[in-house]
Amino acid sequence: MSKLSRKQQTQKRHKRLRRNLSGTESRPRLAVFRSNNHIYAQIIDDDAQNTICAASTLDKDLKASLKVNAGSCDASTAVGELVAKKALSKGIKQVIFDRGGNIYHGRVKALAEAARVAGLNF
């Protein structure tokens, strides 16, 4: 039996996690996607099937202010602060954190902690 690749392991974990995670209007889901070069965060209402707000290292205002590589922990911290600011402006304080099958470490952890410091509760 062949060993699963890291990507396959992540996808398997994400599928298992998503069985129990669902965002509502009162408590939407903060979903994180991490690629090799960038990180993306979305606040999603699964009941209405729409994205309330989103932020990533590709955002124009964030990209201009970043002095570091977009795949770094510092960039993830900036994305966490930005998504929290956008959510708070839309009246969202409580979210469910969806790490997207990634291990809670490094860039995913940096984004989550920055969002918490900026005012989101999860």
From Swiss-Prot:
InterPro entries: Ribosomal_uL18_bac-type (IPR004389), Ribosomal_uL18_bac/euk (IPR005484). The keyword Ribosomal protein applies. Pfam families: Ribosomal_L18p (PF00861). Residues 1-27 are annotated as: Disordered. GO terms for biological process: translation. GO terms for cellular component: cytosolic large ribosomal subunit. Gene3D superfamilies: 3.30.420.100. One of its GO terms (molecular function) is structural constituent of ribosome. Keywords: Ribonucleoprotein, Ribosomal protein, RNA-binding, rRNA-binding. It comes from the Bacteria. Residues 1-19 have a biased composition (Basic residues). PANTHER family: 39S RIBOSOMAL PROTEIN L18, MITOCHONDRIAL, LARGE RIBOSOMAL SUBUNIT PROTEIN UL18M. This is one of the proteins that bind and probably mediate the attachment of the 5S RNA into the large ribosomal subunit, where it forms part of the central protuberance. NCBIfam families: L18_bact (TIGR00060). Belongs to the universal ribosomal protein uL18 family. Part of the 50S ribosomal subunit; part of the 5S rRNA/L5/L18/L25 subcomplex. Contacts the 5S and 23S rRNAs. This is Large ribosomal subunit protein uL18. The lineage of its organism: Bacteria, Bacillati, Cyanobacteriota, Cyanophyceae, Synechococcales.
